[in-house]
């Protein structure tokens, strides 16, 4: 019987594994790779604000974390993640760990899920370098621009260009990102593919647990829910106006506050029909889904959001819930009556009208099943198998 070569997958990620209790595309990718028969292990390489007690820490079955200490703890110094001189020497323990691999007949693949530590692609003889691009990294998430954000943009843009040019294959989570990557290549565009975000279908579609309605603080009626990281890219002002116009609706927010004290989010929370639960364990998210009538994705108009394809779209649909999204052009092709309504702009009347439209068949089992069927085609395992085909990694295992 033929013995497959063992593979070590090194994933460059934006943050430590358990930060904010959120699970992004990169976490699902790491777990998928760790579960493959030929995988020896996955190493999660990430920046960290402080030095770690151990160089390598097990964070999940088959996944170890190697954290690279930031230049300084303040956000303004994060440019060090993209500038070789500030991190090169900190990668030595990782390279030492990988050195015996080739001698043992093992293959090493490098996955970039954000454009940090670009020099790593040249410091080792990788079998494959893959860039899984899921954000417009150089654009400010808030949509605002200043001297500091312009400096940050240039540093990140330069780092990302190096990774794009070095990568053997590139996958993008939206058509917009695909086009942006294509612009940076003079040749080799055939190595770029679009693979949109997916869903852990069984987790969200099979939930039978009764929801804890005490979360709604005694409120009855229609519930609109946002579940995920609460960040400056969201349009809190528009939602505030909508909440004022629809006092009988409840606006439920589930997730960690990453707004850096955004005043508009704090003002929103003062309204009596707005509830914020704080962070939630990822395993509990399907239970929160049962509380809501409409999943909302209220994004601002900004260059950053042009590229976004939210994780939550297919999670809401897998739970049988209709969805309303704003200023997410990558999702406009998903529009379907009583399934997904897409709105451009920041007028609360348009948002309210879209919500009322999807409520037209609220509770109808035919439409619930239609939503689930759409989500079923986007199961993460199917999408990652497609990515593996594009890379050709398993073909040579």
From Swiss-Prot:
The organism of origin for this protein: Bacillus subtilis (strain 168)
Induction pattern: By phosphate starvation, via the PhoP/PhoR two-component regulatory system.
Name this polypeptide is given: Putative teichuronic acid biosynthesis glycosyltransferase TuaH
Domain of life: Bacteria
GO molecular function: glycosyltransferase activity
Pfam families in the cross-refs: Glyco_trans_1_4 (PF13692)
Keywords for this protein: Cell wall biogenesis/degradation, Glycosyltransferase, Stress response, Transferase
Family, per entry: Belongs to the glycosyltransferase group 1 family.
GO biological processes: cell wall organization; teichuronic acid biosynthetic process
EC top class, as a word: transferase
EC number in record: 2.4.-.-
Note: The nature of the anionic polymer present in the cell wall of B.subtilis depends on phosphate availability. Under phosphate-replete growth conditions teichoic acids are present, whereas under phosphate-depleted conditions, at least part of the wall teichoic acid is replaced with teichuronic acid, a non-phosphate containing anionic polymer. The synthesis of teichuronic acid is accompanied by degradation of teichoic acid and reutilization of liberated phosphate for other cellular processes such as nucleic acid synthesis.
NCBIfam families (UniProt xref): TeichurnBiosyTuaH
UniProt pathway annotation: Cell wall biogenesis; teichuronic acid biosynthesis
């Amino acid at each position: 019987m033929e013995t497959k070569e063992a593979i070590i997958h090194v994933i460059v990620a934006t943050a430590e594994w358990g930060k904010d209790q959120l699970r992004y595309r990169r976490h699902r990718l790491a777990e998928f790779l760790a579960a493959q028969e030929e995988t020896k292990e996955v190493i999660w390489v990430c920046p960290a604000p402080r030095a770690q007690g151990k160089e390598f820490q097990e964070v999940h079955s088959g996944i170890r974390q190697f954290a690279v200490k930031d230049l300084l703890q303040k956000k303004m110094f994060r440019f060090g993640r993209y500038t070789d001189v500030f991190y090169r020497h900190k990668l030595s323990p990782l390279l030492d760990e990988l050195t015996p691999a080739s001698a043992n007949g093992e293959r090493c693949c490098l996955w970039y899920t954000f454009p940090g530590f670009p020099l790593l692609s040249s410091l080792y003889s990788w079998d494959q370098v893959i860039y899984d691009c899921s954000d417009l990294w150089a654009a400010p998430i808030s949509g605002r621009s200043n001297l500091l954000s312009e400096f940050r943009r240039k540093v990140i843009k330069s780092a990302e260009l190096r990774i794009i040019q070095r990568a053997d294959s590139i996958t993008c989570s939206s058509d917009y990102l695909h086009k942006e990557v294509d612009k940076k290549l003079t040749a080799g565009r055939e190595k770029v593919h679009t693979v949109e975000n997916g869903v852990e279908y069984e987790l969200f579609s099979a939930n039978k647990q009764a929801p804890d309605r005490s979360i709604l603080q005694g409120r009855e009626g229609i519930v609109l829910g946002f579940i995920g990281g609460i960040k400056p890219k969201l349009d809190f002002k528009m939602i505030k106006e909508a909440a004022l116009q629809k006092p009988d609706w409840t606006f439920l927010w589930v997730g960690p506050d990453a707004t850096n004290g955004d005043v508009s989010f704090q003002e929103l929370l003062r309204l009596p029909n707005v509830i914020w639960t704080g962070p939630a364990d990822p395993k509990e998210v399907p239970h929160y889904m049962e509380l809501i009538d409409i999943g909302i994705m209220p994004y601002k108009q900004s260059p950053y959001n042009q590229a976004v394809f939210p994780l939550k779209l297919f999670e809401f649909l897998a739970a049988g819930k209709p969805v309303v999204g704003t200023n997410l052009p990558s999702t406009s092709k998903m529009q379907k009556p009583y399934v997904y309504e897409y709105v451009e702009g920041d007028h609360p009347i348009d948002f309210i009208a879209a919500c009322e439209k999807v409520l037209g068949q609220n509770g109808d089992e035919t439409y619930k099943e239609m939503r689930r069927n759409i989500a079923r085609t986007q199961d993460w395992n199917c999408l990652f198998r497609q990515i593996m085909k594009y890379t050709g990694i398993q073909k040579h295992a």
